[in-house]
């Protein structure tokens, strides 16, 4: 009975007026006030009157700082470096709810990562609403972008792995890939958001590339890195997606051969261009198409993991797991393939090398330590 119900995030920006009518909600906090949440709650419990005001962040130019020094996962830390998006894909509400691109100052990010490293974390993951846009909002004289940020963080002692969140395919040029491949910490694990393998569908989505350009990006990564993991997102049942368009996407996915695919059924979002498009696809058709691609994803994922059998790899151990009654310590390779070793105390956050000898199940490979 003494708890406060707080509404925060994208839905607040999109439907704040509706939330204000909801008597179950005590506090409404806009996206650009999350950093003040503790203070807002403190004020609320003091006088039960103060509430976060929903602010228009559509034209906000400042990144909201929210520093974290300790994370529940004691091996991998997620570092958000950017917020907002300028892309305006036709199915997406994010530019309206998160505002335009706002990048954190590189010195602030470096300071946070140094603190993370001192706390014992060995791996960081750079994330953002549209990570590839990092730095586009800086003044020209700053000359900062995602690549310069990665190079800066690559120099920090204690950080052994730097993983990237979802990337816009167009950021992957030959120069970009070559520069990444030279770095000590970079993980050859790249999530390139696709959404569709059909050019006609991509055009309706307002994606700013075509299938051939996307494929070229994948080829560049595979030429510059040894057996990189390439993962993606795919939307099925986008308005107007015909059987032939879906078949074209399926053929494209087979040709690229991803490590993992996140398959989403298109969901109508009020306020987006796609919500009012004609030829909305029936739910049953979406489910059929989703099932087809999920089966393909499972097959391709198994095939990619199979390439690691008999190879020497390194895994960063993270947590204990039990498989068929036997306890193991599980972690990930730099490509984000799950590997495990027989359980021992004190292995968490340790890096071990060995050879993958067999699959323990569909997702985890057994590593025999050197």
Label the model's feature ranges.
Residues 147-148, 152-161, 173-232:
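Radical SAM/AdoMet-radical enzyme domain recognition
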Residues 88, 92-99, 161-170, 196-207, ...:
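Conserved strand-turn element in the central/C-terminal portion of the radical SAM core barrel
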Residues 89, 109, 126, 164, ...:
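Conserved, mostly hydrophobic/aromatic
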Residues 139-152, 174-188, 241-259, 283-287, ...:
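Short, electropositive alpha-helical surface patch
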Residues 3, 26, 52, 159-160, ...:
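A structural micro-motif
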Residues 276-370:
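Terminal RNA-binding accessory module
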Residues 121-148, 152, 156, 167-175, ...:
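Conserved glycine-rich "GG(E/T)P / GGGxP" loop and the immediately following alpha-helix
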Residues 1-135, 145, 175, 180, ...:
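Proteins enriched for Cys/Gly/acidic motifs involved in redox and nucleic-acid/cofactor modification
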């Amino acid at each position: 009975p003494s708890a406060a119900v707080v509404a925060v995030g994208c839905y607040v920006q999109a439907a704040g007026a509706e939330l204000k009518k909801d008597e179950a909600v005590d506090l409404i906090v806009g996206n650009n006030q999350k950093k003040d949440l503790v203070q807002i709650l403190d004020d609320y419990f003091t006088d039960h009157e103060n509430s976060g005001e929903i602010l228009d962040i559509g034209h906000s130019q400042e990144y909201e700082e929210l520093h974290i020094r300790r994370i529940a996962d004691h091996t991998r830390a997620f570092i958000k470096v950017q917020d907002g998006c300028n892309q305006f894909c036709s199915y997406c509400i994010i530019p309206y709810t998160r505002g335009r691109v706002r990048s954190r100052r590189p010195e602030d990010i470096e300071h946070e990562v140094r603190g993370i490293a001192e706390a014992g974390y060995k791996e960081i993951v750079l994330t953002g609403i549209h990570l590839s846009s990092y730095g586009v909002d800086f003044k020209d004289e700053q000359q900062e972008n995602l690549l310069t940020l990665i190079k800066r963080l690559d120099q920090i002692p204690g950080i052994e792995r730097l993983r990237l969140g979802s990337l816009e395919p167009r950021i992957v040029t030959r120069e970009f890939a070559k520069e990444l491949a030279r770095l000590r910490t970079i993980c050859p694990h790249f999530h390139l958001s696709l959404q569709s393998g059909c050019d006609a569908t991509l055009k309706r989505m307002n994606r700013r590339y075509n299938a051939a350009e996307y494929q070229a990006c994948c080829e560049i990564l595979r030429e510059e890195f040894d057996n990189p993991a390439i993962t993606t997102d795919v939307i099925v049942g986008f308005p107007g997606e015909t059987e032939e368009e879906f078949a074209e996407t399926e053929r494209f996915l087979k040709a690229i051969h991803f490590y993992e695919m996140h398959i989403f059924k298109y969901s109508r979002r009020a306020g987006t261009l796609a919500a009012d498009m004609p030829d909305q696809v029936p739910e049953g058709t979406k489910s059929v198409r989703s099932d087809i691609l999920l089966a393909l994803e499972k097959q391709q994922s198994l095939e990619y993991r199979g390439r690691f059998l008999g190879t020497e790899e390194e895994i960063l151990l993270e947590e204990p797991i039990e498989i068929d009654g036997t306890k193991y310590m599980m972690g990930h390779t730099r490509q984000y393939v799950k590997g495990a070793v027989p359980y021992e105390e004190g292995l968490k956050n340790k890096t071990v090398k060995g050879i993958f000898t067999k699959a323990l199940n569909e997702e985890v490979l057994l590593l025999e330590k050197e």
